[in-house]
Regions:
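Positively charged, small/polar-rich N-terminal and surface patches that mediate targeting and assembly
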Residues: 1-99
Length: 99
């Protein structure tokens, strides 16, 4: 199982979510609709001075679905090369028992 974290410019949010939902059956995720911060080139604070904003999408996927998600995100990056899109995929260790 993998944890996928995606941070991207709000301008590509619809393309990303539609691509993932269309191509990965039962794609479940958590969406954090607005993030503020600083990327490599500029601030994204949602203000008059720094108007751009990011969003974050988190999902837990089986390995084949994580591979599909990576392919989908690569296609969106190719379509929108100037928009900030960062994808992080990590291994997940599941723990069971009393907490």
């Amino acid at each position: 199982m993998k944890r996928m974290e995606l941070i991207a410019n709000k301008s590509v949010e619809n393309e990303i979510i539609e691509g993932l939902e269309k191509n990965i059956p039962d794609f479940y995720y958590t969406l954090i609709p607005e993030l503020h911060g600083r990327g490599k080139t500029k601030y994204k604070l949602g203000t008059a001075t720094w108007p751009e904003r990011n969003f974050m999408l988190i999902s837990f996927l089986d390995d084949p679905e994580a591979d599909k998600a990576e392919t989908i995100i690569r296609k969106v990056k190719e379509q929108f090369p100037r928009e900030g899109i960062k994808l992080f995929i990590m291994e997940v260790v599941l723990f069971c028992g009393n907490f």
